[in-house]
């Protein structure tokens, strides 16, 4: 059995998977990391077997007016990611189909979830979702980023289900490409993020920051942030001066998205 870690997205999506890959290899497990071509050197430096998915990060957004709009709007940014996924879906689907074998263990973030569900069903694989932000459906505000209501609320539950549905849907082009290739079953409930083959969920956030919600799915584990250690890195003098100038700052963020 190989642990196939699927990291579709930015550096914030890749680094936790790379940290997990290194930990698994330290335990003697077979690991294969799938990611964008841009990250092959980082995987090589970490000693992790890597296979690119035949596509690269989005280039600079043009025209400049659209780039400014994307920086200021999560909606526009999401639409640009959706367009990129649509254009890259065929290459990613082919890479997944080649890399995954019966009995493997798939670990994927949200953008690869629909496609990995299809492969898990078709090839008898175990599937674990790696959530890098507290966005699982829940009624409890303390366990949900961007919760519209404090405490427990049905509005929170409805909001989080809608966010979940929209996030999983962004990866549907990859699942559809798999379906057309014959590597997955027809896209139905599994592609919409309902029911299916997820055997467990890892919430890679600190339990001190994100308490476990009572209504999270069974098998959900809050592990803390998966940190890729870089002992050779040294902070630049300007950063050291900043850190020494007062009380230690507190950064709160999930994945590659700063929150506060």
Where are these regions (language model features)?
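Nucleotide-sugar-dependent glycosyltransferase catalytic domains
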Residues: 36-41, 45-249, 254-259
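Short, solvent-exposed loop/turn segments at secondary-structure junctions
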Residues: 13, 259-260
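N-terminal subdomain of nucleotide-sugar transferases
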Residues: 1-51
């Amino acid at each position: 059995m190989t642990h196939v870690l699927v990291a579709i997205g930015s550096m914030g999506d890749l680094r936790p998977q790379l940290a997990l890959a290194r930990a698994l290899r330290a335990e003697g497990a077979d690991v294969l990391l799938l990611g964008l071509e841009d990250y092959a050197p980082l995987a090589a430096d970490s000693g992790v077997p890597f296979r690119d998915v035949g596509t690269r990060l989005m280039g600079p957004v043009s025209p400049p007016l659209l780039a400014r709009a994307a920086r200021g709007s999560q909606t526009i940014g999401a639409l640009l990611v959706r367009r990129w996924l649509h254009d890259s879906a065929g290459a990613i689907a082919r890479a997944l189909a080649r890399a995954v074998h019966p009995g493997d263990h798939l670990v994927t973030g949200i953008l690869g979830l629909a496609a990995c569900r299809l492969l898990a069903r078709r090839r008898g694989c175990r599937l674990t979702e790696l959530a890098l932000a507290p966005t699982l459906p829940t009624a409890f505000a303390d366990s949900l980023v961007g919760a519209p209501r404090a405490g427990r609320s049905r509005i929170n539950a409805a909001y989080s289900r809608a966010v979940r549905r929209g996030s999983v849907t962004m990866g549907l082009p990859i699942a559809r490409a798999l379906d057309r290739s014959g590597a997955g079953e027809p896209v139905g409930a599994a592609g919409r993020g309902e029911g299916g083959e997820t055997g467990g969920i890892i919430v890679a956030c600190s339990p001190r920051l994100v308490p476990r919600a009572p209504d999270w799915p069974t098998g959900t584990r809050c592990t803390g942030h998966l940190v890729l250690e870089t002992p050779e890195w040294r902070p630049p003098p300007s950063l050291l001066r900043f850190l020494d100038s007062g009380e230690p700052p507190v950064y709160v963020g999930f994945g590659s998205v700063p929150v506060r």
